[in-house]
């Protein structure tokens, strides 16, 4: 599903917890989130990792430009660039 925003935080949590990866743009910066074995990494495209080995809750609480992921992932402030396994 390309470019489709998440309707609820629960949908987003389920999506990540089942092993899917995400590309998104927030405030003009492209980020990636990848999960493996209940551990998550966050990176900036073409710049490298900014967080490694996070739990799901730590991922949701990770701040992007001062705002927690959980507070903007379902809003129109974020553009979902890709979703894939």
Predicted regions and their residues:
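Compositionally biased, low-structure terminal segments
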Residues: 7, 13-15, 41, 46, ...
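Mixed-charge, Lys/Arg-enriched low-complexity segments
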Residues: 1-4, 52-85
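Amphipathic, interaction-prone secondary-structure segments
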Residues: 16-47
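Negatively charged, low-complexity tracts enriched in Asp/Glu with abundant Ser/Thr
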Residues: 1-23
């Amino acid at each position: 599903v390309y470019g489709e925003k998440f309707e609820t935080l629960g949908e987003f949590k389920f999506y990540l917890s089942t092993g899917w990866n995400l590309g998104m743009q927030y405030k003009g910066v492209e980020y990636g989130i990848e999960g493996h074995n209940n551990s998550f990494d966050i990176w900036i495209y073409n710049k490298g990792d900014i967080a490694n080995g996070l739990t799901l809750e730590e991922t949701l609480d990770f701040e992007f430009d001062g705002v927690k992921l959980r507070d903007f992932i379902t809003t129109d402030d974020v553009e979902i660039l890709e979703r894939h396994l």
